[in-house]
């Protein structure tokens, strides 16, 4: 999983919630979209899910989502947008640009655990990501 949010407190909350689920998910973190794209292009193991905040410095979630969903390798990764914005424009734009889910913050901790548990279970069962070794040949 790749967690992209400029707020370190929010990232810690997500990590705590994922830890409470009880499975050993590997979690990579990025503080903005540019860090996320750099990570995705340089990793040997693509995440099964990207959790992406919309409003961040350097490269925001909107730009990052577009870049992910237009990349032939990265586009298969499900992206869950989590934002404090519930504006129809932001929600519609996210889905139009390839987001798989849009959730509005803040969450109650218990709700966050339940949501992440369902998401991770669903995406890990039904998503097959490209084999990077095959793509490089």
Regions found by a protein language model. Give the residues of each.
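Conserved acidic segment of CheY-like receiver
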Residues: 1-18, 34, 50
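A short, hydrophobic beta-strand element within the central beta-sheet of small alpha/beta folds
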Residues: 76-86, 94
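Receiver (REC) domain active-site loop signature in two-component systems and cognate sites
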Residues: 56
């Amino acid at each position: 999983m790749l967690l992209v949010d400029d707020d370190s407190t929010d990232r810690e909350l997500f990590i705590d919630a994922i830890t409470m689920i009880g499975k050993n998910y590997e979690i990579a973190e990025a503080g903005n979209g540019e860090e996320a794209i750099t990570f995705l292009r340089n990793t040997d193991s693509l995440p099964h899910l990207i959790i992406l905040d919309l409003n961040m410095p350097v490269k925001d979630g909107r730009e990052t989502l577009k870049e992910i969903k237009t990349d032939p390798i990265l586009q298969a990764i499900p992206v869950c947008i989590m934002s404090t914005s519930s504006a129809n424009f932001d929600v519609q734009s996210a889905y139009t640009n390839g987001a798989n889910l849009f959730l509005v913050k803040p969450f109650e901790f218990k709700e966050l655990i339940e949501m992440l548990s369902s998401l991770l279970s669903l995406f890990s069962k039904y998503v097959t990501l490209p084999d990077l070794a095959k793509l490089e040949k």
